[in-house]
């Protein structure tokens, strides 16, 4: 008899979102208490099903248990399965759970006196048992998991064949189940040939995914990979949920029940979602997208979940598109009451696929509704992409009022559940048939075009927590492109140009330019219009649309001079390069064109993140002064002039232009690194180190911080601080692995020169301690992280998508978090106008 063992399992679920795993058997219930935060729940068995396709939640009530853990545990520990009392459960709760488990036999009936006597003399479990944790470790550490899986199955079958002569080495029933699942998944099949794979264990759900680097993967190979993957996870569920002496039949029942119990993981839609934030921010785009992504990454599912989604919280809409799990991925055998383990037919797999897809939609819709009370509608579509076609199998609009009336713990007849939502669906004889997809993710109702209005041209105001977090009360206060207004007018002009073969094209084009730009309030637009008109009239400007557009936006004298200077620098002619731009730059600076005043400051920003962080760090200053943007050409001109001076060894002159760059762009890592180079040439190492400290104190992205540590390592080494240099090298390697080879060579020299001073194994804690001891900031600093997170969330809640995408991508590169990656994927691209 296989009795349930109460056990604790730590599974990382991000910032505390609970995930429920249903463990159901067709003829017995084997429960697993996996929660640190709540007592195990128990339910009674329902009527016995007669076949796989006849199983329903009303016939077999699943027993569910929460799977929770701290996020840190996910990074360090494997799932620990141990027979111990759940510390957070009350004595009464545990007593009830144990009592319920002890009253159930594998047949779901109360023990008779004879059976009680039989249990007293039950056989010892076999010496061999299924060690899933060891298997997971082997395949995730292997270069290719397939040979390891073959060795695993081969060992089981060998011991099975020798069991008559060596009974002590006979594989357990769960081992036989594991071998059968992998064999039926095509592990030993030669065709289709599998590419080289890697097995990864997801941090949030601990499920195993098989990944390959090939993009053009044959469809049949894809199906085989997905089936192998699902077989591995079926082994996982059986291993962590069942006792060592469980039978193959019980393992089949468990996984069949799990596939039909996935909706039981959903919590009531009005139950507040665990939030990573401790503040009182209103629910918005950030919390909804994060919540949906967290659900996708943490729920326990028997098959890989591939889903895309879009949200429009302001209008109460969420759209989700699921990739249907193909019927070919479902198991090739199943347990049927009265028949035992039998092969599945194509019809049975199609029915199972349809049933699973319908339940998955309910689970995801429930999770989306729970993210915010503002969500009123969740659209879900299931599609399947094959080599020849893309089919949609259902489209349904779940509204919050009707959905709240569904009993997610007892769905009953799925067709009745769906009927109230009037879905676009053909559900015939348990099969889903293709239908026309009635909505698409990129529609205006899910992706409003207002989100991509050019930031510098927006007239929208901001208030409340959004304005405070972004350091501005209007969207245009996040602008970074000085040329936006010219680019917008240039686009309009290009659409109005006359055909080149028109005899009066010049006259018509001049009129179009003057009508659209002649009276523009922006002086740079009027100047560009005059420049283009002169070129059209004297014939120096070709009248095709692209040429005119380029001239309008980038045709100023300084930009043209910079293009020439770059070519001369590449030819190692720094003097001539400087002569091309220095006079123009000097004339601007002497005239004070971009000089700061008490009411206006001129700045350059390389990214929206940089602008938002600048707003926050300089909020007090900007209350008194307006920030104006300098042209990219002006900033670049100072850089090129400084470079030409460095090429000629004139450090002081180079430093003057580098200081102007830092004044214009105080958060730009390039400016800081360049001024460090100038100070190095002048042997002013202490000042260079201070500049690097300033860079690291404000670094917000991996590349800037990484190069900051790389340069700091050089100066620490130069001053004899070997351990500090080593710590900086280690930090840089972590942040910018692209230059790992260069840094490794330099570290080798450092080790050879200082064999008695370097530390062989410098752990992260030791690195932090050394950096702090040498007054070197640990980038990104806690203050920078707080500002960054506030700005990221505010920009998404305010639906300023050019800014939000910038923040999200940098956050993803720093964190490497699957949930954040999901948020990034949910941000739609700019619509094509």
PLM region descriptions:
Residues 585-586, 694-697, 722-741, 747-755, ...:
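TPR/TPR-like (Sel1-like) alpha-helical repeat modules
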Residues 522, 533-544, 551, 605-625, ...:
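Alpha-helical linker/edge segments of TPR/alpha-solenoid repeat scaffolds
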Residues 527-532, 544, 556-559, 563, ...:
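"A position-specific structural signal for the A-helix of alpha-solenoid helical repeats
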Residues 101, 105-108, 112, 130-136, ...:
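Boundary/linker segments of alpha-helical solenoid repeat arrays
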Residues 12-22, 26, 30-70, 75-499, ...:
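Long, charge-dense low-complexity segments
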């Amino acid at each position: 008899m296989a009795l349930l063992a109460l056990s604790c399992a730590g599974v990382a679920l991000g910032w505390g979102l609970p995930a429920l795993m249903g463990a159901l058997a067709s003829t017995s219930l084997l429960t697993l208490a996996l929660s640190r935060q709540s007592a195990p729940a128990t339910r009674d068995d329902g009527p016995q099903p007669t076949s796989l396709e006849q199983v329903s939640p009303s016939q077999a009530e699943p027993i569910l248990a929460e799977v929770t853990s701290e996020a840190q545990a996910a990074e360090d520990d494997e799932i620990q399965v141990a027979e111990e009392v759940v510390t957070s459960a009350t004595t009464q709760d545990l007593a009830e759970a144990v009592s319920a488990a002890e009253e159930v036999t594998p047949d779901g009936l109360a023990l008779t006196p004879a059976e009680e006597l039989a249990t007293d003399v039950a056989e010892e479990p076999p010496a061999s048992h299924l060690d899933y944790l060891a298997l997971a470790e082997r395949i995730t550490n292997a270069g290719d998991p397939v040979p390891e899986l073959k060795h695993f199955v081969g060992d089981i079958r060998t011991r099975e064949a020798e069991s008559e002569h060596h009974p002590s080495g006979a594989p357990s029933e769960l081992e036989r189940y594991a071998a059968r699942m992998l064999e039926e998944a095509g592990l030993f099949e030669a065709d289709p040939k599998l590419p080289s794979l890697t097995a990864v264990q997801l941090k949030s759900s601990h499920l195993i995914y098989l990944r390959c680097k090939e993009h053009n993967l044959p469809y049949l190979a894809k199906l085989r990979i997905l089936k192998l993957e699902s077989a591995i996870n079926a082994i996982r569920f059986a291993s962590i949920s069942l006792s060592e002496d469980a039978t193959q039949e019980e393992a089949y029942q468990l996984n069949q029940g799990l596939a039909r119990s996935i909706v039981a993981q959903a919590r009531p839609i009005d139950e507040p979602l665990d939030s990573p934030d401790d503040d009182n921010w209103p629910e918005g785009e950030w919390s909804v997208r994060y919540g949906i992504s967290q659900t996708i990454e943490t729920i326990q599912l028997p098959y890989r979940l591939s889903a895309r989604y879009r949200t429009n919280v302001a209008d109460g809409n969420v759209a989700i598109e699921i990739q249907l799990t193909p019927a070919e991925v479902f198991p090739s055998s199943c347990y049927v009451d009265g028949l035992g383990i039998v092969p599945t037919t194509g019809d049975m797999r199609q029915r199972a696929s349809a049933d699973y897809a319908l339940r998955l939609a309910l689970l995801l819709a429930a999770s989306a509704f729970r993210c915010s009370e503002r969500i009123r509608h969740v659209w879900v579509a299931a599609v399947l992409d094959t080599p020849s076609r893309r089919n949609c199998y259902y489209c349904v609009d779940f509204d919050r009022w009707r959905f709240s009336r569904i009993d997610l713990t007892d769905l009953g007849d799925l067709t009745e559940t769906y009927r109230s939502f009037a879905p676009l669906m053909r559900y015939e004889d348990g099969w889903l048939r293709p239908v026309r997809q009635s909505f698409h993710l990129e529609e205006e109702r899910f992706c409003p075009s207002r989100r991509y209005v050019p930031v510098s041209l927006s007239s929208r105001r901001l208030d409340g927590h959004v304005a405070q977090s972004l350091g501005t009360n209007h969207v245009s206060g996040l602008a970074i492109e000085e040329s936006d207004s010219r680019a917008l007018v240039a686009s309009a002009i290009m659409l109005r140009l006359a055909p080149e073969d028109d005899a009066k094209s010049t006259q018509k084009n001049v009129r179009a330019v003057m009508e659209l730009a002649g009276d523009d309030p922006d002086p740079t637009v009027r100047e560009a219009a005059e420049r283009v008109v002169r070129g059209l009239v004297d014939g120096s400007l070709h009248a095709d649309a692209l040429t005119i557009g380029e001239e309008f936006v980038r045709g100023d004298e300084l930009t043209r001079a910079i293009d020439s200077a770059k070519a001369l620098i590449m030819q190692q002619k720094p003097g001539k390069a400087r002569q091309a731009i220095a006079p123009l730059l000097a004339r601007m600076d002497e005239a004070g064109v971009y000089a700061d005043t008490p009411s206006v400051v001129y700045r350059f920003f390389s990214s929206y993140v940089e602008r938002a962080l600048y707003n926050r760090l300089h909020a007090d200053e900007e209350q008194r002064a307006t920030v104006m943007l300098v042209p990219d050409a002006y900033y670049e001109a100072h850089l090129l002039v400084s470079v030409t001076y460095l090429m000629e060894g004139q450090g002081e002159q180079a430093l003057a232009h580098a200081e102007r760059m830092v004044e214009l762009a105080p958060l730009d890592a390039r400016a800081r690194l360049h001024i460090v180079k100038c100070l190095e040439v002048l042997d002013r190492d202490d000042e260079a180190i201070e500049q690097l400290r300033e860079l690291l104190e404000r670094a917000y992205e991996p590349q800037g911080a990484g190069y900051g540590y790389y340069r700091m390592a050089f100066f620490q080494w130069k001053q004899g601080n070997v351990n500090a240099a080593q710590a900086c090298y280690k930090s840089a390697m972590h942040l910018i692995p692209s230059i790992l080879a260069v840094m490794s060579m330099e570290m080798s020299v450092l080790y050879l020169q200082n064999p008695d001073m370097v530390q062989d194994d410098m752990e992260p804690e030791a690195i932090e301690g050394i950096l702090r001891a040498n007054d070197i900031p640990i980038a990104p600093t806690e203050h920078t992280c707080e500002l960054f997170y506030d700005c990221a969330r505010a920009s998404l809640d305010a639906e300023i998508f050019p800014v939000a995408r910038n923040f999200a991508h940098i956050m993803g590169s720093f964190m490497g978090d699957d949930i954040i990656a999901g948020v990034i994927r949910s941000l739609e691209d700019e619509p094509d106008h």
